[in-house]
Amino acid sequence: MQILVDADACPVKDIITKNAKKYGIPVIMIIDTSHELNDGYSTVITVDKARDSVDIKLINMVQRGDIVVTQDYGVAAMGLGKGAKVLNQNGLIYSDANIDRLLFERHLGQKIRRAGGRTGTIRKRSKENDEAFEKALLLFIKPESEGPRDLKI
């Protein structure tokens, strides 16, 4: 098991690294050339700035049982399809039970924006978001004797 992170705009890199170190889990942070990252623990892979290059690299690397951190529903769907455990930066655990709805909502939002509409505002990140993320991450990485490894939603 390893943790693969779509790290370009990921606000929880420190939380991932802290917990991965604690449990001895390798972390791969994937970024494009417009970002720099060195946390002293993670393997950092830098890819071209081309559209979806980080996403494609991540999905090509993921294996069954890996943990994927992404806020991209398309990446989440492909990760689930490859047998990964997938969550976003706010602790939302993607699953077969919710990914179709999330992809459909993304599609509707894109249609509204293309037609000139607005779909909402982005809330400022909170301490509660970080806590929810860490709790969800720990569900996936704690040894079985300490807690569940698989969560069905």
UniProtKB/Swiss-Prot annotation:
InterPro entries: UPF0178. Pfam families: DUF188. Coiled coil: none annotated. It comes from the Bacteria. Belongs to the UPF0178 family. This is UPF0178 protein Ccel_2994.
